[in-house]
């Protein structure tokens, strides 16, 4: 799936609105992930996963800010995400299917927070962008 110029513009434009709320949006997306797909909690046994926890806000912020870095380097996702790809493939060994689940909960969260901006074209662009990110993050899996 190749991102068009209009897809890239939509991702970058919405990122500008997401950035100031990165921790809150990330925490909400993770909380939604854990509620909808409880099996994903296994990677976070050392976290406080309760609503409003600092762990959710901190890690959610890391996830969303990593997407921001990807958006800033949207034409070279491989280089921008290389370190994270190594981390997820070799150290964390996250089930690759979980990236699709997280992609879904991120999109739901974005739709709730940015209902006017997150129209069909923007949602399609973010869906493609998150799929590209997931492809890069799982590219080093064996």
Swiss-Prot record:
It comes from the Eukaryota. It holds the Pfam family Globin. InterPro entries: Globin, Globin-like_sf, Globin/Proto, Hemoglobin_a-typ, Hemoglobin_oxygen_transport, Hemoglobin_pi. GO terms for molecular function: haptoglobin binding; heme binding; iron ion binding; organic acid binding; oxygen binding; oxygen carrier activity; peroxidase activity. O2 binds at residue 59. Residues 2-142 form the Globin domain. This is a larval (tadpole) alpha-globin. Belongs to the globin family. This is Hemoglobin subunit alpha-3. The gene is hba3.
């Amino acid at each position: 799936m190749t991102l068009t110029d209009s897809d890239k513009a939509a991702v970058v434009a919405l990122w500008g609105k997401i950035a100031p709320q990165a921790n809150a949006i990330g925490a909400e997306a993770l909380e939604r992930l854990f509620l909808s797909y409880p099996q994903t909690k296994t990677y976070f046994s050392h976290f406080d996963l309760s609503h409003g926890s600092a762990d959710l806000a901190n890690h959610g912020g890391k996830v969303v800010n990593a997407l921001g870095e990807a958006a800033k380097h949207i034409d070279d996702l491989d280089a921008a995400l290389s370190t994270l790809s190594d981390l997820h493939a070799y150290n964390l060994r996250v089930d690759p299917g979980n990236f699709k689940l997280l992609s879904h909960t991120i999109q739901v969260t974005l739709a709730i927070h940015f209902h006017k901006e997150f129209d069909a074209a923007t949602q399609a662009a973010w869906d493609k962008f998150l799929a590209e990110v997931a492809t890069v993050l799982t590219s080093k899996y064996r």
